[in-house]
Amino acid sequence: MIERPVPGADAPIGIFDSGVGGLTVARTIIDQLPHESVIYIGDTANGPYGPLPIAKVREHAIRIADELVERGCKMIVIACNTASAAFLRDARERYSVPVVEVILPAVRRAVASTRNGKVGVIGTVGTINSGAYQDLFSASPSIVVNAVACPRFVDFVERGITSGRQILNIAQDYLEPLQAEGVDTLVLGCTHYPLLSGVIQLAMGDHVSLVSSAEETAKDVLRILSQQDLLADPDMHPEPSYSFESTGDPEIFAQLSRRFLGPIVSQVRQNEG
């Protein structure tokens, strides 16, 4: 375990993803915990993680999480489904600070949401092949789970393409098997996918509930920080700080980040990884 001085309540929350997808989680955390400071690292030089071998994903995740811990973050949020599947168990053994992931919160929400017990899961190849979602759903034997990999979605989001006929056609092809199975709840098992929720909803139909882990993950962050007396005190630190960083091209990352988060992204720093 990496031992560091115990961070105080005024320390930042560290969040990372392979790219911009984790901004969906960061945005929800910032909205729900407005007094918390955040360091966000998008590993765009090495992402997307989905097609990579699990060992390589774990290597990248360790490098970034180690950095966030070394920089004094009081909590690590793995805002990437593929990295959560590859790294969560190791992370909780490796770090003394709490680690939050995005898979269990989505499963919890889906189990509560489904009406007919038929749930679909879409994600990267790495996430789907890991069986992480399927394993967690097995604790609810009344739920029938169908999982489909949608490998091209991440590339579209990373290029800033979140609507249009081309991506809709691809979505319809990916999602047709889930429609045929009659799922009434669809887990967006990649933090990039909420940025395609309009297209995905159109392809699935309004009768299908889309589940994003962002809201539930933010609830976990709030609960754990409260339990460990690590919530930032607005009287002591009324102005939170936000640092957005990319291991790839910071300008491209900044353009996409501002599109999704707005002016809160004043600049994006180059992270040398």
Curated annotation (Swiss-Prot):
Keywords assigned by UniProt, alphabetized: Cell shape, Cell wall biogenesis/degradation, Isomerase, Peptidoglycan synthesis
One GO MF term: glutamate racemase activity
Domain of life: Bacteria
The protein's annotated pathway: Cell wall biogenesis; peptidoglycan biosynthesis
A Pfam family reported for this protein in Swiss-Prot or TrEMBL: Asp_Glu_race
EC number: 5.1.1.3
One Gene Ontology biological process: peptidoglycan biosynthetic process
Catalytic residue list: C80 (proton donor/acceptor), C190 (proton donor/acceptor)
Catalytic activity, as annotated: L-glutamate = D-glutamate
Class in the EC hierarchy, top level: isomerase
Keyword Cell wall biogenesis/degradation: yes
Binding-site residues, substrate: D17, S18, Y49, G50, N81, T82, T191, H192
The protein's role, per its UniProt record: Provides the (R)-glutamate required for cell wall biosynthesis.
Protein family per UniProt: Belongs to the aspartate/glutamate racemases family.
Protein name as it appears in the record: Glutamate racemase
Source organism (scientific name): Corynebacterium glutamicum (strain ATCC 13032 / DSM 20300 / JCM 1318 / BCRC 11384 / CCUG 27702 / LMG 3730 / NBRC 12168 / NCIMB 10025 / NRRL B-2784 / 534)
